[in-house]
């Protein structure tokens, strides 16, 4: 019997992720991304529920 090795063996322990040094700009950017994602999620939920996106009221035609 022959044994086959199908590529690189996985290590038993995963390497630890290195802690990144974040400056205030990176933190602000990530917060903005989270806020945008939350707003998009709320908008999608509003669209699925069938509610109007904006309160436009009665539509008026240009005719008299």
Swiss-Prot record:
Transmembrane segments: none
Sorted UniProt keywords: Cytoplasm, Nucleus, Protein biosynthesis
One CC-aspect GO term: nucleus
Region entry Disordered, spans: 1-38, 45-64
Biased composition regions of type Basic and acidic residues, renumbered to the chain: 27-38
Gene Ontology terms: biological process: cytoplasmic translation
Biased composition (Gly residues): 53-64
Pfam family, one: TMA7
Primary site of residence: cytoplasm
Other comments on record: Present with 3100 molecules/cell in log phase SD medium.
Function (record text): Involved in protein synthesis.
Family, similarity comment: Belongs to the TMA7 family.
Subunit record text: Interacts with the 40S ribosomal subunit.
Name under which the protein is recorded: Translation machinery-associated protein 7
Gene label: TMA7
């Amino acid at each position: 019997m022959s044994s086959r090795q199908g590529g690189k063996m996985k290590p038993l322990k995963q390497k630890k992720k290195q802690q990144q040094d974040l400056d205030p700009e990176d933190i602000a950017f990530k917060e903005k991304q989270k806020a945008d994602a939350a707003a998009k999620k709320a908008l999608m939920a509003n669209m699925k529920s069938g509610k109007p996106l904006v309160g436009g009221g009665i539509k008026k035609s240009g005719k008299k």
